[in-house]
Curated annotation (Swiss-Prot):
Gene Ontology terms describing biological process: L-histidine biosynthetic process
Cross-referenced InterPro entries: Aldolase_TIM (IPR013785), His_biosynth (IPR006062), HisF (IPR004651), IGPS_HisA/HisF (IPR050064), RibuloseP-bd_barrel (IPR011060)
Alphabetized UniProt keyword annotations: Amino-acid biosynthesis, Cytoplasm, Histidine biosynthesis, Lyase
Cellular compartments per GO CC: cytoplasm
Name listed for the protein in its UniProt record: Imidazole glycerol phosphate synthase subunit HisF
Record's function text: IGPS catalyzes the conversion of PRFAR and glutamine to IGP, AICAR and glutamate. The HisF subunit catalyzes the cyclization activity that produces IGP and AICAR from PRFAR using the ammonia provided by the HisH subunit.
Chief place of localization: cytoplasm
Length: 256
């Protein structure tokens, strides 16, 4: 059985890690490379860096951050934010990133998914989907872009299936309703997407307790859990999380 993954997420703005609630009210959480090293040492399986301002300000994710991180950590990491061309992806992978995450650019130009998948292999291409529940519509979500500021009107489940067909290797699925709240993942959303695609789904948005993480694996059928606020705020450690999940008999890589 493939091991389930715990992935700290570092949202970056202006060169600093930030975290907010529902994509707003951002607060400083530290230096990205320092935090990356800390989480790597503490047993993270992978890392994700998301430049949350890049898409809004139409500028590329900093290759410098990738280069610094690649020299400092030994675990795989993904970088996303403002990546809108095959050449940008090439620059980031050459700088040391293992994967890239495409969000707004994939919606604007879906061909970028297939082009980049052919060029670099689908294992390098993660499609980030920022999902928000439709008002008064149970079981329906819409895709948001531009750092969660713009509603595309695209149905999340239809988009998830399409990106898989275009060559995505993974889906990074964020519940905008749960982001930063620490009230639990959106299990209905996560399971709904996991049930219709055959590629791994990384659940994001809402982790606040050991039980939340267990539930998103067991009930949500996620392949990986993204963790941010509860780690940055030192509410839980990766060792505590892994110990708990191993006691629950989930296939987690042991803390070393």
């Amino acid at each position: 059985m493939v091991a389930l993954r715990l992935i700290p997420c570092l949202d970056v703005a202006n060169g600093r890690v930030v975290k907010g609630v529902n994509f707003v009210n951002l607060r400083d959480s530290g230096d990205p490379v320092e935090l990356a090293c800390r989480y790597s040492d503490e047993g993270a399986d992978e890392l994700v860096f998301l430049d949350i301002r890049a898409s809004v300000e139409n500028r590329n994710t900093l290759v410098n951050l990738v280069s610094r991180t690649a020299k400092s950590v030994k675990i795989p990491f993904t970088v996303g934010g403002g990546i809108d061309s095959v050449s940008s992806i090439n620059d980031l992978l050459r700088a040391g990133a293992d994967k890239v995450s495409l969000n707004s650019s994939a919606v604007i130009n879906p061909d970028l998914i297939s082009e980049s998948s052919r060029e670099f292999g689908n294992q390098c291409i993660v499609i980030a989907i920022d999902a928000r529940r439709k008002v008064d519509k149970v079981g329906e979500w819409e895709v948001y872009v531009k750092g969660g500021r713009e509603n595309t009107g695209i149905d999340v489940l239809s988009w998830a299936k399409k990106v898989e067909e275009l060559g995505a290797g993974e889906i990074l699925l964020t519940s905008m309703d749960g982001d930063g709240t620490q009230n639990g993942y959106d299990l209905h959303l996560t399971e709904s997407v996991a049930n219709i695609v055959d590629i791994p789904v990384i659940a994001s948005g809402g982790a606040g307790s050991l039980e939340d993480i267990y539930d998103v694996f067991k009930e949500g059928r996620a392949s990986a859990a993204l963790l941010a606020s509860l780690l940055h705020d030192k509410k839980l450690t990766l060792k505590e999380i892994k110990t708990f999940l191993l006691e629950k008999k989930l296939p987690i890589r042991p803390y070393e």
